[in-house]
């Protein structure tokens, strides 16, 4: 094979790398992380790596120093740069390739699911400072999606890009990363890089290597069962029910918006909705905007048979463009295919459902026609053989964590748990494994981890009851107490009852930054609210004591809320709670002989208000182990 052909093959093999050179010169290949506007971690040895022809000599020039190496027999090479002082921008040269606008500062690895991935463009109305951001000293790199359970990947998929936080680039950021980077920069005045490796709707085990999942049983993949399940999930409406002229007169009717359960739809699969309507003449043939609120989980939307948009998971606002020429005189049609494999299909109330033109609009809420496309119950006999397939794990670690292992970081930020709330009992050991795994991958046993506790979500409960989200928060808290060099941001006041992706990422970032100031930067600062220590019973009262009360216990508002108390019957009722002598005294006239207390123990405990005098909320807790 000729030299040019060899280089072409290497270029195809290592997709996502940048190349420089020509037929007569050497081709140096770099991972997409090594590019313009990159941020390198200060104060530690730095690895710059890539690929070239075997035996090719490589010279890296940076800040007046030269580093030499040679590609090995597999074409791999790397150099180690000594610890660097913060600053920039600088140039880096790798042979003939020039990397511009390089900064040296602090880099944070951001992992998790959709709230870590939440795009900043959704927040511009709430935080008008975002579109006019002008900070070129903080940078953002979004790791391209890559999921592969077969084994680790040496390089990222596609080509990631570093973006600054200037007005022309800030919309490429994720929201939590932006606010956290801003906090760090404003205090320490060093460049900040946010390396975001996240994917919406993912389980924690997807982010853990196979080696660190050895204590969690796995099922073998059953190919026959996979094929049978695929056939059972084939949607009867595909290619037919979205047509404008389809006859839906035999379909049932339903009010939109609303939930499947309240309208009697008992399906774990897809439901097709259709609505016919007439237009104002001003909208015929013109471009329009279709507003379809929010839905659970996945929607595909058609107007007069033309596909106009899809969103793959619950949360994002559904706003779709309807091209000119689609809307016609007479009867028009909107068709919605809504898929919810867990049976919790929902078209969320109090959102906008309209078709808007330049001058007129059509209200779309009201009566629609509907029919079931498929119900995964038909696949259940086969799915039992694939019970653990969805939780097989490691695919995202292999594709989105392992390839960035050489990039030195200051700390990791983990925001995930929504997907695991239904299996909260195993979350603490999984999160412990993830932290140990990433620390081993980076070769840093004391790598700091900043954890986000799940915020409040879903409707408030009238009576105390158990909660998967509360148990998940408990698991996150336990890990933060049991695993060294971790800090927890309590956020049950920063969510939204009807949106799993709350907009207030600034509050979350500020609380994460308090933890960073303490465990990353070594400041003596209060970073935690009161932490339950113990209890004693006196008559019909339970007296609670706390650690980390700082300058003393306090509460937001006039009185403590969201305490529940129970006797031996384990039936919790809302309780009265008061702060006395640095402790909390809990009681209820309904419980004569109390044995247990719970605080902020619900999906949505937003009214819970126990804090210290620094204003930091207590983490939810319980005194029982029921």
Describe the role of every protein-language-model region.
Residues 64-87, 294, 301-354:
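Beta-strand-rich ligand-recognition modules
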Residues 66, 549-626:
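C-terminal beta-sandwich/jelly-roll accessory domains of carbohydrate-active enzymes
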Residues 41-44, 264-268, 278, 289, ...:
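Surface beta-strand/loop "capping" patches
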Residues 49, 251, 277, 281-305, ...:
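Aromatic-lined ligand-binding clefts that engage carbohydrates, nucleic acids, or primary amines
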Residues 24-54, 102-110, 117, 253-267, ...:
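Non-catalytic, glycine-rich low-complexity segments
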Residues 87-96, 333-336, 595-601:
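Short, aromatic- and glycine-rich surface loops/edge beta-strands on solvent-exposed regions
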Residues 97-164, 196-261, 331-398, 402-409:
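An acidic-aromatic loop/edge-strand motif
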Residues 27, 33-106, 342-344:
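Ser/Thr-rich low-complexity repeats and stalk/linker segments
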């Amino acid at each position: 094979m000729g030299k040019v052909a060899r280089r072409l093959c290497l270029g195809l093999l290592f997709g996502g790398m940048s190349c420089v050179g020509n037929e007569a010169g050497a081709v140096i290949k770099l991972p997409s992380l090594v590019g313009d506007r990159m941020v390198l971690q200060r104060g530690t040895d730095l690895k710059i790596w890539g690929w070239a022809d075997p035996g090719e000599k490589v010279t890296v020039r940076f800040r007046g120093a030269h580093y030499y190496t040679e590609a090995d027999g597999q074409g791999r090479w790397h150099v180690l740069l000594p610890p660097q002082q913060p600053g920039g921008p600088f140039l880096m040269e790798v042979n003939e390739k020039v990397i511009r606008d390089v900064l040296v500062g602090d880099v944070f690895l951001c992992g998790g699911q959709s709230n870590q991935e939440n795009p900043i463009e959704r927040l511009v109305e709430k935080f008008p400072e975002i579109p006019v951001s002008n900070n070129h000293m903080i940078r953002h790199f979004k790791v391209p999606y890559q999921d592969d359970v077969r084994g680790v990947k040496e390089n990222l998929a596609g080509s990631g890009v570093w973006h600054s936080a200037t007005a022309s680039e800030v919309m490429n950021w994720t929201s939590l990363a932006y606010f956290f980077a801003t906090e760090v920069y404003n205090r320490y005045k060093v460049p900040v890089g946010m390396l975001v490796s996240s994917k919406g709707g993912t389980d924690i085990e997807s982010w853990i290597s196979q080696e660190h999942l050895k204590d969690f049983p796995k099922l073998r993949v059953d190919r026959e069962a996979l094929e049978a399940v695929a056939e059972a999930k084939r949607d009867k409406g595909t290619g037919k029910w979205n047509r404008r002229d389809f006859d839906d007169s035999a379909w049932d009717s339903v009010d939109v918006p609303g939930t499947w359960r309240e309208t009697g739809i008992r399906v774990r699969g897809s439901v097709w909705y259709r609505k016919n309507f007439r237009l104002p003449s001003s909208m015929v043939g013109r471009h329009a905007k279709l507003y379809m609120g929010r839905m659970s989980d996945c929607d595909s939307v058609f107007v007069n048979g033309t596909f106009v948009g899809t969103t793959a998971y619950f949360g994002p606002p559904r706003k779709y463009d309807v091209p000119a020429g689609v809307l016609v005189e007479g009867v028009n049609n909107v068709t919605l295919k809504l898929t919810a494999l867990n049976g919790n299909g929902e078209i969320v109330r109090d959102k906008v459902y309209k078709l808007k033109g330049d001058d007129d609009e059509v209200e779309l809420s009201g009566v629609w026609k509907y029919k079931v496309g498929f119900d995964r119950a038909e696949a259940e006999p086969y799915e039992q053989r694939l019970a653990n397939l969805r939780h097989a794990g490691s695919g995202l670690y292999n594709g989105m964590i392992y390839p960035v292992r050489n990039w030195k970081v200051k700390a990791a930020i983990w925001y995930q748990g929504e997907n695991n709330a239904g299996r909260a009992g195993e979350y603490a050991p999984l999160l412990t494994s993830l932290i140990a795994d990433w620390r081993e991958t980076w070769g840093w046993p004391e790598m700091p981890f900043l954890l986000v506790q799940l915020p409040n979500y879903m409707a408030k409960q009238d009576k105390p009851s158990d909660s998967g989200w509360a148990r998940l928060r408990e698991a996150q808290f336990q890990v933060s107490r049991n695993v060294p060099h971790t800090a927890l941001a309590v956020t049950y006041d920063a969510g939204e009852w009807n949106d799993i992706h709350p907009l207030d990422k600034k509050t979350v970032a500020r609380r994460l930054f308090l933890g960073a100031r303490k465990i990353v930067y070594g400041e003596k600062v209060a970073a935690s609210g009161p932490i339950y220590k113990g209890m004693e019973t006196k008559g019909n009262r339970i007296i609670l004591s706390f650690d980390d009360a700082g300058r003393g216990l306090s509460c937001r508002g006039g009185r403590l809320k969201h305490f529940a108390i129970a006797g031996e019957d384990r039936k919790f009722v809302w309780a009265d709670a008061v702060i006395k002598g640095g402790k909390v005294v809990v009681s209820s006239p309904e419980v004569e002989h109390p044995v247990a207390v719970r605080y902020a123990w619900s999906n949505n405990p937003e009214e819970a208000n126990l804090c210290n005098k620094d204003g930091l909320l207590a983490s939810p807790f319980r005194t029982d182990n029921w």
